[in-house]
Every structure is written in C-alpha cells, then in structure tokens.
Amino acid sequence: LGNRNKRMKIYFQRLVAVSVCFLLVFLGSNYSKAETVAPITLNPKDVEAFTNKVIPEKMKKENAAGVALVVVKDNQILFQKGFGFSDKEKNTPIDPKKTVFRLASISKVFTASAVMQLVEQGKIDLNKDIVNYMGGLKYQNNMSEPVTMEHLLTHTTGFDYVDPRPEDIHYQDNDYTMLKDYVEENMPTVVRMPGDTYTYDNFASMLQGYIVQNLTNSPFYKYMAKNIFYPLEMHNSSFVMTNFIKEKLATGYDAKGNAIPFYQTRPTDMPQGSMFSTGSDVANFMIAQLNNGKFKNNQLLQKETAEDMQKTKFALHPKYPNMTYGFEFFSPQSHNGQYVFGKGGNIPGFSSLMWLIPEHKIGVFVVTNKDSSALPVEVFDDFMNNYFPDKTKPEYLNPNEEELKKFEGVYRDLRLKNLMSHVNISEGKLYVSDKVYGKQELKQIDPLLFEDEKGNYMEFKLHKDGTVKEMIHWNSGSSAVKLSEPERFKDVDENHPYAKFINPLHQYEVLQANREGNFTPESSLTRAEFAYWLSQIAYFTPHSKKEPVFSDVKNHPYAPHIQKLYEIGILYEKEGEQFHPDRAITRQEAAWITWQYLKMLGAPSADATLKGETDDWAIESVKNIVGHRLVGPEVIYNEDGSADYLSKQSMKRQEATALLFYVLLSS
C-alpha cells in the first residue's frame, strides 16, 4: 500500500505540474505571424555567453543536477553544451551528444511525424473515422460525428479521460505491456463533439502511435527506429528501453535532489511519452523540421507536409492558437510577436522543452534531469526576451455592461476538472476569479479576447447561436466550458446555512436531485454516497472497470467509484472485510477517508486541539480536518481554537458538502 500511495502522489503531482505549474511560465504573446521578418544575428559565441550566464543561476535556484542545451540555426547545430551531472554520485558530466534523457511528451511530435509519413503514402486520410485504421478495435462515441486523425493530431477528440493511469509508472523491469492491449483496455468514450474543444490529450497521441503500428504491421518502436531515427541519424534514440540506452540514461532527481529509482512505463512502447534521446539527436529532428522536412540528403517529410505540420490547426481565437499537427502553442505574451511553437515534456525525474521559430530557422531544445522543473521554460522566456525583445502592448476597448453579459458564468476546465473560473460583472467591469490567482479584472483587447491583471490572455469562443460557452485562460493546456445553471434543490433556499456549499457542488455536477427535486440536506449520508461524491472530485482518473475488491459492493450502483478510491490508495481492504456501502457514514470515517485523499495530494499537516470523543484510529485525520478548517457551521471553534468535531455522529448530507467543497478548493 505504501508503494501505491507513493505512486499515486507522484502521478497527481506530475499531472498538476505539467498541466498548471509548467504552463504558468508560458503566459502570453500574439501568435499571428509577423508581417516582416528581420534576420536575427545568432552566433555560437553570443549563445555561449547567454547560456553560461542564464543556466547555472537557474540550476542553482532549481537545485537541478544537470542540463543539456542545443541550438540549431540555418540547418546546422549552432551551439550545444552540457551543464552539471547526469549522475551526481559518480560526478558523470552531462554530454549533449551522449547523455540520454527521457523526453516525456516531446515524444508526441515524433509520433505525429510518423503519422504524416503515412498520410503522404495515402495510408491515412486525416478526415476519415479512425475506426478504419484500428484493426478491429472500436471506441464508444456518444456524439453524432466520428473522431478523425485530424482530431487526434490537434487534441480535439472529445474523449472523457485523456491522461495515463497512476500505475502506468512502475518499477518492474520485466513487465512488458503491449501497446494494443493497453489501448483496448483503456479506450475512452467520446463525450463532446469532436473538433469543438481542445484538451491536451495523451490518449490521442497514443492512438496515433497504435494506428501507425497497425497500418505498418510493425511494432511502433521499430517503425520509429527505421523511419524516423535512422534517416535523421538519431543513433542514441529509442521508444523502448534497451541496454544501450540504459547505460547512457541520466539519473532523474526529485525536487529535493534525491535520485528517483529506475522505472518503466505502461504501455512499454508508449507513443505519447516513452522516447529516450540526446540533445544532439533532437537537434537533427529540429533541423529537418526547419529545412522543409529534409536532413542532409534524407527527406523525412515532403516540403508541403512539413509546412502543413507547422500551421495553426486549432485556435479558440486567432490571436491565441492552440495546436498544429503535433506541436502546441504556449500562452501568447512571452513570444514577443514571433510565430513560435514547440513541445514540453515532463515525467518523473526529467523536464524538457523544444521550441521552433521557423521564420528565423531557429530551434532550441533544453532538458534537465530534475523532476517537474520550470527551468526549461524559464530559459525559453529569457531566450525570447534576449533575442526578440520587442513587445507590443495591447490597446484596450471600452465595452458596455450589456456587451459583457454574454461572458458571465462558471467555467470548468476540461482536464483539471476541479479548476473552476467564475466570470462576472461588477460595477460595469468584467472579473474572473479562480483558486490559483484569486479575483482579477479583465480588460478587453478584442471582441472575444481579454487580458487579466497579470498579463495573461483569456479567450472566449462565440457559438453559432450567439452564446459564449467556452474559454481558455492561463491554463493553455485545455479549454474550459461554461456550466449550465441547474434548477435549485426545492428544499435548499438561498438562505439555507449550507447553500454556499450545496449550490456550487450542484452546479459542478457532484450532487444530483432526487425524483422530487430535493437534496434532503439533513438526512444521513451513506458510505457509498460519500465515496461517489469524493470520486467525482478525484477527477484525474476514471471510475474503475475492474471487479470490486469489497464483496458487498459488487452489484452496487456506486461500485465503480468505490473501487476507484481503493485503486488510488484512499480505501483499504483487509481479507474478508466488507465496505457496508449503505450504512450511514460517521463524521470520523468521512474525515479519515478525506485526509487519505488530501495526503495523497501532498497536503501539509495541521494540528488542532480536539474536544469530545474521537476513536484513536481517526485522531490524526480529524485533527487535520479541524486544523485546516474544512468544516461547516456545525463545528464551533472555541476561543483557544479547539473544537468538537462530533466525530462519532453520522454525517449529514449538508455537512458532507461543506467538507467536500473545501476539499475541491484545495485540490
């Protein structure tokens, strides 16, 4: 169980790091191509001076063990250098030509390139249903339009779950998971119209690789070795671990500088993230992309294909595009008016970034053997400010209140589903508030584009019926959709003491009304209902399809959600133990389950003086719930800060909404 909890904690923190913290550095610029492109002077001596100044200070700040950087320009490697160590214990220096790193999501652009090769050969039609290329595998589609390869390449599939499972990082050397088996077992469901919304989509990139494998009758990693790595002379690159790669692989380190044990992935041959490579090898790929698909005498892609890959293919707003075929755009402001796209990668122990500026034939790749590091994107920011310092300040419009009304509402991020953005008008101005930045004024710079107080853009999408239902703010990795206002519970009026908890959770689709339209706030909550509500908040993994471990929940309607909490390490099962799903949950039981969840997410401990009676096994959990004040008005705090949590009482439904509302805000 210890390994399960540790793995889950690493998984969640990595997901958040990639989806939020990593993206926070990419805050802003206009991605439209510059009307005139002046040549930029870039020479090895100047780049070396720049990197020698910037990288060591960022390594010190980040406690990063090592960094490799490579810059290409005009179809050649202009500069490459290693900093620090690939193994601190052995003092092995980083060598950009020899040190192998895990590239994580940068793998996706290589996979997309393989897809485009098959498009050139006529084996794939970008606008045809992908089921035609899946070798008999099928996907459930709740919409009227099929998923196409275009949707896979632009991450606009409409899939319900797009990220890997916690157990996809594992420590079993001989555990080989076949790509086809993984895809078949974990196929998501299409729940939004394909092509309508953008969500960073790991499964879409994995499906691309599976389709390449299926159409070529070759294991994915072998196709990539023969058709991508070999013509690009990428001799130190692979999608699967080999002894040759393992010998050269840098040791990955966590945030505290501790070495991360060697691990494998599921599937083993993972198109969306298992690639290993060196700085020099990646440089050859960037050269081909910037040279009309050609590296030396080898034509990796036709000129037209390479150009097509680099064009904007999905944009919620023309000034804030999201995807090319395989590459992504970062948030606009930091690009200083240049047309820049690239790809970031983050996996335990490694963080990386590649960016291309095609009009200047410049490409840069930065990688560090440090977990969840902002170093690569900070180097990007400094690079752009140093070599492309011009920034154009936007001119603001002056809309009236009537023009702003269509933007009001609560928007839910499609990937980070606990991230809610509240957009509202106050005194004639538009504001947005969320749990990351708080409340900020939005200034309009275009009919559907705004800038917040920190300089981040917020773009909205106007639908054919004239309504606004979607936006992207600082989390450029996903659209956020406007939630409909549900019909209020008949038995919860606006003055109800728990209305401020119940109504938001109702709108967030955690709570549902009964047949009479009531919530029954003072009724006791069952253990199964509590597990279901918490499962809805634990958004980052789907409900389980496996046989429940608890014998008494096998036919229960909430069995998949109870099993999910077990699989992610929140619930435990002893041999022969039952869950008692329909028994009322006590407040100390709810506190214990909730604290397991919050600990898994890395919540700090909080102390509290407890009054009343609490069982020994629940004291730690209740202290933390009380100490963090994750309670409703039923808990009264004394002047000295102590409180009676009423631990042994049954938890009422209204009380559970207070607890889970605060959990949602903190997770």
Give the role of each language-model region.
Residues 45, 61, 83-202, 216-218, ...:
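Active-site-proximal loop and beta-strand segments within enzyme catalytic domains
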Residues 5-19:
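Bacterial N-terminal signal peptides that target proteins for export
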Residues 94-98, 189-194, 205-206, 262-272, ...:
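Flexible glycine/proline-enriched surface loops and loop-helix/loop-strand junctions
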Residues 20-26:
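Hydrophobic core
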Residues 12, 30-35, 166, 480-497, ...:
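Feature responds to low-complexity, polar/acidic, surface-exposed segments characteristic
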Residues 35-81, 216, 225, 230, ...:
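Catalytic loop of the DD-peptidase/beta-lactamase superfamily, centered on the K-T-G motif
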Residues 69-76, 102-130, 152, 185-186, ...:
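Alpha-helical scaffold elements that line and support the substrate/ligand-binding pocket
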